[in-house]
Amino acid sequence: MNFKNKRKILSFIYRYSLRSFFLLILFNVNKSLANNCQNIGEIGTSGSCNGKLIVSRQNLLDAISDGSYTVIGPGNVSYTFAEGGTGDIYTGNINDFSSLFKGKKTFNQDIGYWDTSSATNMSEMFSNARRFNQDISNWDVSNVTKMNRMFLNARYFNQDINGWDVSNVEQINLMFRNAHRFNQSLNSWDVGNVTQMAHIFRGAKAFNGNISAWNTSNVKNFIAVFVGAKSFIQDIINWDVSSGTRMNH
């Protein structure tokens, strides 16, 4: 092997080793950031949980049940549900958001900053939370599969959630039933995996959103989808209802 070739080989080994070294550092940094945000009951020190109290579902349930909507962190410091309070909370480890505010008729705090990226179930989350009407358009719901009755009887809710990634959602039964003021376009929703949408807009008196492009080819249950949706006059002639087995009312 001549000197020139040897030099090329050594140069390659050096560059490869250096690249591997930096990749290893980056991996460990990212791993450290992720682990940091998994420490329930502690204050995050970096990443998306930085400065926030890392909470569990049970922490939320306890704070809701006593009506304080506040979780006590280290040093007896209060961390509020609403953004901009005495301290924010980090919800990125919670999978189950179902029924959190069910029946909380006066709840209307700004929780748009919550991290919902791990959520899989949001059924009944705001069921009968009649006053709730906050901007939650930035929520990451890409892993959610169930949204049944999510806004059932949430009579004041009328926020733009057209940007939600609902591509993994399978069940949206009664999602907006009796959500009297809801009237937003949902034309960007990918409902291709939805199989159940019975009563979804039942009693949604103001709803006249554009849903003409929905892919309903996998939906089996269409029962009473628009019963009582007095304002709805959109064209849904192109809906594929070939999988429908229940289409009463």
Regions found by a protein language model. Give the residues of each.
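N-terminal secretory signal peptides that target proteins for export/translocation
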Residues: 1-15
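A cross-taxon signal for low-complexity, glycine/charged-rich
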Residues: 4, 22-25
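Sec-dependent signal peptide recognition
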Residues: 15-22
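Negatively charged
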Residues: 22, 29-249
